[in-house]
Amino acid sequence: WNLNQEDIYKIILDRGEGKISKDGAMVVKTGIHTGRSAQDKFVVKESNNKDSIWWDNAKEMSEENFDLLYSDMIEFSDNKDLFVQDLFGGADLEYRLPTRIYTEYAWHSLFIQNLLITVKEEEKSKFDPEFVIIDMPSFKANPARHGSRSETIIAVNFDKKIVLIAGTSYAGEIKKSVFTMLNFLLPPKNVMPMHCSVNVGSDDDSAIFFGLSGTGKTTLSA
């Protein structure tokens, strides 16, 4: 639970999940999915979101199918060692999202710990997760049982603030799930989420870089 990077590195190596490169970076394989599975993402349609989501670009999922998937994944995890990280999505104290992430793979725990904001020691006793992600790459969804398109599924329930990820080892799904929840929660608070990077000039003027993933936003802002 909330292991530090050194301990996670050791577990990754002991379990054969990855190798360390000559530069000290952890190298892993994501399996058949080398990117996000946008066609396998489903959203539970409910009264609180039916008018606020662009459904032409989102697949609907019934609450019954979501609950069944949830219970099946919990049962599947009974005899597994899971890794848990309590983290914040966002840096602003007023708008950050307390998030708890359960992962089947140690390297997924390392990945998301690197991307989100660690809970400070003095904050741990009061940490109360508002959002939960359960990430089980080796669990295979059943289209007939769960209403999925394939064995891979990313199931989003905005009402319960839970995301279920199954059938994919691509860790970027975890990161995107945090963005998805923030994109839903922040606009009603008059905050506009943006997929961008920022740098600051010598006169304290700022520049914002927009672009699709991998187009160089972070490089330009570094």
Predicted regions span which residues?
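A noncatalytic interaction/capping subdomain that flanks phosphate/NTP-handling catalytic cores
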Residues: W1-S206
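Glycine-rich phosphate-binding P-loop
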Residues: V200-A222
